[in-house]
Amino acid sequence: FDPGTMTIGRSYVFHYPYVTTPCFLIDLGSPAEPGEDLVTSEGETYRWSGGVGPNRSIVAFSAICAHKMSYPTRSVSFIDYRHKPMSGDGTGSNWWDRGQVIYCCSEGSVYDPRDGARVMSGPAPQPLAAVSLEFVAEEQALMATGIYGGAMLEQFLEKFGFQVALAHKIDDVWRPASGTTGVWPLDEYSRTGVC
């Protein structure tokens, strides 16, 4: 995927590590540095590797909310990235007037994509799982190379496997994503954005 085609602040969806598991791809517009250690709901510690790309501003996370596993579908998305503040003066004293957050309006979980999708507010018990990206400068290409943190992939496919099999018109919901996968702007992927 050519990151030069991305619009800063717009959320994109791709499927990884399986053809049925959605992830966000976001260009934050400025470098996203690695942060402090993060902890999964199982107590495992990991360190987010930060942004990639020409400006180190491109990040990717699982688009499956860590609370009740809301995720973007073709018909609706209850989870999305908000680049601009929802209200307020943008000073960041509250998450809703800071902007640059991933917000799940199903139950109100808020994640900070500049800090490894750390939970800022709401009931989510852990950050969104991080997707390892590699930027190949010679080809101007992004590649997903792994997923880490509290991925919740087994729980997701056990709970929603039948639904995603129908939506993707496939029999094997565990089929690995390989080669070139589709990348869609979320507002084109989902017909209705709720948040």
Model regions: which residues?
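Extracellular/periplasmic metallocenter environments
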Residues: 67, 102-116
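N-terminal pre-ligand scaffold of iron-sulfur
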Residues: 1-92, 129-195
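A conserved acidic, glycine/proline-rich C-terminal tail/linker
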Residues: 118-120
